[in-house]
UniProtKB/Swiss-Prot annotation:
It comes from the Eukaryota. It comes from Homo sapiens. Residues 137-147, 157-184 have a biased composition (Polar residues). Residues 516-549 form a coiled coil. One of its GO terms (molecular function) is zinc ion binding. This is Zinc finger RNA-binding protein 2.
Length: 939
């Protein structure tokens, strides 16, 4: 049949050539060129072919240049109409006799590539598709078209002319050339003025090597015209631009009857990158650009919606050029960019390609949507076709536009408009901001110029301005625009503030590097703060462990060692389980000590009563000091005493200090007496004591409405007793630091010697001074030692209950407890601390031949146990040894003078299968309690 003779390439092999001219059936008048989409390709835009001019049948001859034919293979199912451009790479370059004189090198495709191409079937059915060849000045390329409605065929036409494809108009066409013409003299293809949007064709199914080898031979895509009614063409003298079979190579050329149009200049291929706004001269340069670092950065910036060309030094960009995708920091910089060579180059390139050029009015980059730059758009051009349906969403890649020929008018609605400026056009360069000399936060180009007088002009010998030199910044520049930008810039403003005007305001927005350094510093500070907080939490947890009742020490379901079978070996003890550092399980001794401490701690009512009485006494003594100072001043004025003294305005009463158990926080339940030390500027006398005792009741009435009784002790004490329950007594000891000083140390100081009989008891005054020193030492050394205060309270209760321990001085006991607890290797619980103190006493610390206790608050070596006799020391040592034996046999409650605490309920404790009777458990418990009550405590 005619179709099988027209396509004569074998399937799966390379192009075959034959020297015998085949007998070709000539097409009828109504025949038209058809194109079908190639199977196996992704949907793409189907470009149209240039229309062919009618030619006569008798004068038919093959094209004098290269003949383009397509290989044939069995018919495959034709897919539905697609919208993306499908590029078919099955080329076979058959050479005619006339073309062999100038073309020696055939272009062949591999068999693997040709085997996957779609051609017409060898059968002569009406649905047979035909392939057409189109000459190109740079190679061979075919564009497949989707099958559309076939034109109406006249009754006189043969069946071989039936086709399903587009019918092309005959407005323009490519005329056949003579056999003597060369390849580069082909006329430029004519384009349909109707242009549609370019949809950025992609090649998802192409191998990279195939694309690299075939990309130089891609001709420009042609826009498809809308399908129109079938046209009846007059009989042409010869078909122009028709495809020829491989066997038509040996057919002698027929003389051309139509005039050949004048060929225009050869158009170079332009490879355009929409992302970078640049063009490449060749495919190799274009591929290198796509693999370059600059293109990858801009592509990544488009995906994330960040402007690739941000403003320098972290300053937020204000103006944006949509044509070059460049951000400017101000109106001056934007105007300089518009005048620059880069913008002009991109402008000329867009004008040459026929791409839409956005308005030159600056658009605020901050007000544009973040995805405006990254949104892939399809630029229009003369070699771009619009698709009938939108393409599938793909990642934005650089589109390659092969542009040839002059640009054509844009089609209406081909692509959306470029982003219009949302704000009106800004003022020209040099417009100062409203803030005066203040720097604009968005950039420094809009700020008012600062210090232009420090920029001097450098002239040549002829008097021509060579450059500008800034004396503040020690920099030079050649352009007047650069000078204007410099005096508005941040660097110049910083130097101006540093050297000329320190009060010049400058925007404090840091640069990207400074911001990173600040963030790193803040991160380190947060890390250190978290570590300190974690240490503080651990310290508080340790304190709560010592003060509060810790969790159960024995884990649940822990059977005793003897309950395991002999063959299983000895299991690990519960204490060997990993515990948190600083945490220890609570013992029975700890529970008993803490329970005893809770019973001897003063009640809230007692603490409030002590606080109220002490506060009233301190305020009343302050008023007494003021009254005595006024009396002394009046007496001196009356006597006319003009003798100069070291401190003429010194008060007699200097201050009052808390001492004893009140200052140390060792109050127990039932304590009703607290002590205060009243310091004087001179040695206290009995007359001063009487004056204080007389003034104090009147000042107490002025301070409070509570009733107090004031009494004086001839031994340098004043007692204030409250008349309300609980009755608290505040003992005030009058003393002076002069009682401890040696008069011989300051021989040059002359002091009036008081009467020896009028001075208060030196012993009582020294005891008051010693109590003041003891309170300061305790607050510095023992108050921060957590179990120390608890143990001292428990031992004070022991000294109060047991007469044997009553002989131990309170100050010696405090020193002993502090030494025992502070010398431990690790933190101790309350029970272990009591045991350690008893061990120290039991080893003979209190005996005369023992180490003893050195008083740290005395100048000379003084034993704190000096008031104790030898018998008392031995009795306390023996009592401590007996207490240790009771602790070893779990009789801690007898040492502390309390009842035995019930054991804790454990989840893993054994239970009886048979429930106890109503009175069985209670009776047994009562017998045990009665038996234990018969024991004896400390003696």
């Amino acid at each position: 049949m005619a179709t099988s003779q027209y396509f004569d390439f074998a399937q799966g092999g390379g192009p075959q050539y034959s020297a015998q001219p085949p007998t070709l059936p000539l097409p009828t008048v109504g025949a038209s060129y058809t194109a079908q989409p190639t199977p196996g390709m992704d949907p793409a835009v189907n470009p149209a072919f240039p229309p062919a001019a009618p030619a006569g049948y008798g004068g038919y001859q093959p094209h004098s240049g290269q003949d383009f034919a397509y290989g044939s293979r069995p018919q495959e199912p034709v897919p539905t109409a697609t919208t993306m451009a499908t590029y078919q790479d099955s080329y076979s370059y058959g050479q005619s006799a006339a073309a062999r004189s100038y073309e020696d090198r055939p272009y062949f495709q591999s068999a693997a590539l040709q085997s996957g191409r779609m051609t017409a079937a060898d059968s002569g059915q009406p649905g047979t598709q035909e392939a057409c060849g189109q000459p190109s000045p740079h190679g061979s390329h075919s564009h497949a078209q989707p099958p559309q409605q076939a034109p109406i065929v006249e009754s006189g036409q043969p069946a071989s002319t039936l086709s399903s494809g587009y019918t092309y108009p005959t407005a323009t066409g490519v005329q056949p050339e003579s056999s003597a013409s060369i390849v580069t003299s082909y006329p430029p293809p004519s384009y349909n003025p109707t242009c549609t949007a370019y949809t950025a064709p992609s090649y998802p199914n192409y191998d990279a090597s195939v694309y690299s080898a075939a990309s130089p031979f891609y001709p420009p895509a042609q826009p498809p015209p809308p399908p129109g009614p079938p046209q009846q063409l007059p009989p042409p003298p010869a078909p122009a631009g028709s495809g020829s079979s491989p066997r038509a190579d040996s057919k002698p050329p027929l003389p051309s009857k139509l005039p050949r149009p004048k060929a225009g200049p050869r158009q170079l291929q332009l490879h355009y990158c929409d992302i970078c706004k640049i063009s490449c001269a060749g495919p190799q340069t274009y591929r290198e650009h796509l693999g370059g670092q600059k293109h990858r950065k801009k592509e990544a910036a488009q995906k994330t919606g960040v402007q690739p060309n941000g403003s320098p030094r972290g300053v937020q960009a204000q103006l944006h050029c949509d044509l070059c995708a460049v951000s400017c920091t101000g109106a001056d910089a934007y105007a300089a960019h518009i005048r620059g060579s880069k913008h002009q180059k991109v402008f000329k390139l867009h004008a040459k390609l026929g791409k839409p050029i956005p308005t030159l009015e600056p658009a605020l980059a901050t007000e544009s949507p973040p995805g405006a730059e990254a949104k892939p758009t399809s630029p229009t051009g003369p070699s771009v076709c619009a698709s009938s349906r939108p393409a599938l969403a793909k990642r934005p890649v650089a589109s390659k536009a092969l542009c040839e020929g002059p640009p054509e008018p844009q089609a209406a609605g081909c692509r959306p408009q470029w982003g219009k400026p949302a704000q009106p056009k800004l003022e020209g360069p040099g417009a100062p901001t409203q803030g005066g000399s203040k720097e604009a936060p968005a950039g420094c180009s809009d700020a008012q110029p600062v210090g232009p007088e420090y920029v001097e002009e450098v002239f040549s010998d002829e008097g021509r301005v060579l450059r500008f030199h800034c004396k503040l910044c020690e920099c030079s520049f050649n352009d007047l625009n650069a000078k204007d930008l410099h005096v508005r810039g941040r660097r110049h403003r910083l130097q101006y503030r540093k050297k000329v005007n320190p009060d010049l305001p400058i925007a404090t927005e840091p640069s990207s590097r400074a911001r990173k350094v600040l963030e790193e510093r803040m991160r380190k500070q947060r890390h250190l703060a978290e570590e300190r907080l974690e240490q503080l939490r651990r310290w508080h947890a340790e304190r709560r462990r010592l003060e509060e009742e810790p969790p159960q020490d024995v884990p649940p379901h822990a059977p005793p060692d003897w309950a395991q079978p002999l063959l299983m070996g000895r299991p690990e003890s519960p204490a060997s389980a990993p515990l948190q550092p600083g945490r220890r399980p609570a013992s029975s001794d700890d529970r008993h000590v803490m329970c005893k401490h809770a019973t001897i701690y003063p009640t809230e009512q007692e603490l409030l009563a002590v606080q109220r009485a002490v506060s009233h006494a301190e305020r009343a003594l302050k008023l007494v000091s003021d009254t005595l100072a006024e009396e002394d001043r009046g007496r001196r004025e009356e006597e006319g005493d003009k003798r100069s003294s070291v401190a003429p305005q010194t008060r007699v009463l200097k201050g009052v200090m808390r001492v004893g158990i009140l200052a140390k926080g060792l109050l127990l339940r039932g304590d009703r007496n607290v002590r205060l030390a009243l310091l004087c500027s001179e040695k206290p006398t009995h007359s001063l004591l009487r004056r204080i005792a007389q003034q104090l009741p009147r000042q107490l009435q002025m301070v409070t409405e509570d009733e107090y009784e004031v009494s004086s002790d001839p031994e340098a004490n004043i007692v204030i007793s409250s008349c309300e329950e609980p009755r608290m007594q505040v003992t005030i000891s009058v003393t002076s630091p002069l009682m401890r000083e040696d008069p011989s140390t300051d021989p040059g100081v002359e002091e009036p010697q008081a009467d020896a009989g009028d001075v208060l008891s030196p012993k009582k005054c020294l005891e008051s001074l010693a109590a003041l020193r003891h309170a300061r030492w305790f607050q510095a050394r023992a108050s921060g030692l957590q179990p120390c205060v608890i143990v001292i309270r428990v031992l004070r209760d022991l000294c109060r209950r047991v007469p044997t321990w009553g002989a131990l001085p309170a100050w010696a006991m405090e020193l002993l407890v502090e030494k025992a607890v502070s010398s431990a290797a690790g933190p101790l619980g309350p029970g272990d601390a009591v045991r350690r103190v008893l061990e120290c006493v039991a080893t003979g610390t209190l005996l005369t031949d023992g180490p003893g206790l050195q008083d740290p608050c005395e100048r000379d070596q003084t034993d704190a146990l000096e008031p104790m006799t030898l018998q008392e020391r031995e009795d306390v040592t023996a009592s401590a040894q007996h207490a240790l034996r009771m602790l070893a046999f779990r009789q801690t409650h007898k040492v502390l003078g309390m009842d035995l605490l019930p054991p804790r309920h454990r989840l893993g404790a054994r239970f009886r299968k048979r429930q106890r009777g109503p009175g069985e458990g209670e009776e047994g418990a009562g017998e045990k309690k009665r038996g234990r009550r018969g024991g004896e405590g400390l003696v």
